[in-house]
Design a protein with these regions (language model features):
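A short, surface-exposed alpha-helical micro-motif characterized by mixed small hydrophobic
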Residues: 202-204
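Conserved catalytic motifs of ABC-family nucleotide-binding domains
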Residues: 157
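Conserved ABC ATPase "signature" region
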Residues: 103, 107, 114-132
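Catalytic Walker B motif of ABC-type/P-loop ATPase nucleotide-binding domains
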Residues: 161-165
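ABC ATPase "signature
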Residues: 220-221
Length: 255
């Protein structure tokens, strides 16, 4: 298989529900290789569920996910070897230190111990976690947990990164560092799929994006195509049928 000519991620007819209405309702999506792809949508739109199915963390009721041509469910070993994942609400081994977590992750992936040690050192330094490398993960702040989670996703040098809200709870300095890392990753030929609620972030980082609403893709294309003549936030509100509130009621707040 020529993975270089395959889409970085292809989702075909993904469906998922949890006993009620469809949370993901027939999602089809193609992420070209080498792209910085944004996934946006209102709260509860199905973004996290879609990404969880895309990388094999959640089994779909129907549909397929391929990472560089490898089926996530029928060929998980090859698919998961070339993807790095930062899920929302990542559960980490709480009783390991940051350094131990990276070492454990690398060895579990079958990486050479010397390579694991070298990359662990670099990642801890670049993400400013060196001072906390011997601190238990249970004692990490929300932002530190996000950074160590990103480090585990980067450790094995994947071809595709799938990141669910990677900058949430991260301080501005660390956020800029992470943005630089991701931009360098794409410039070197990697592919990124990133979900976020921050339109300015998506607009500045991504070259392509998809808008999900009520479990369906309502728009997909380049940022310029979806944005049109106005701001991306205006296009987003129009596409999801949102209503900007806050100008009525709550009179008691000023009393």
């Amino acid at each position: 298989m020529d993975i270089e000519s395959s889409p970085a991620l292809r989702l075909t007819g993904l469906y998922k529900r949890f006993g009620g209405p469809w949370v993901v309702d027939g999602v089809d999506l193609v992420v070209p290789p080498g792209s910085f792809f944004g996934l946006v949508g209102p709260n509860g739109a199905g973004k996290t569920t879609t990404l969880s199915m895309a990388v094999g963390l959640l089994r779909p009721d129907a549909g397929q996910s391929h990472i560089f041509g490898f089926d996530v469910w029928s060929d998980p070993v090859h698919a998961k070897t070339i993807v790095g994942v930062l899920p929302d609400g990542l559960a980490l081994p709480e009783r390991l230190t940051g350094r131990e977590l990276l070492t454990y992750t690398g060895l579990l992936r079958g990486m050479a111990p010397a390579t694991v040690a070298e990359r662990t050192e670099e990642l801890l330094a670049v993400l400013e976690l060196t001072e906390a490398e011997n601190t238990l993960v249970v004692d990490y702040s929300a932002g530190m947990r996000k950074k160590i989670g990103l480090a585990t996703a980067l450790l094995h040098a994947p071809k595709l990164l799938v990141l669910d809200e990677p900058l949430e709870a991260v301080d501005p300095v660390s956020a800029r560092t992470i943005r630089t890392i991701l931009q360098r990753f794409v410039a070197a030929g990697g592919s990124v799929v990133l979900s976020s609620h921050v339109m300015a972030l998506v607009e500045n980082l991504c070259d392509r994006l998809a808008v999900i609403n009520r479990g369906q893709v309502v728009a997909a294309g380049t940022v310029a195509e979806i944005r049109g003549e106005g701001a991306l936030e205006e296009a987003f509100v129009r596409l999801v049928g949102g209503r900007i509130g806050g100008d009525e009621g709550l009179a008691w707040l000023a009393s």
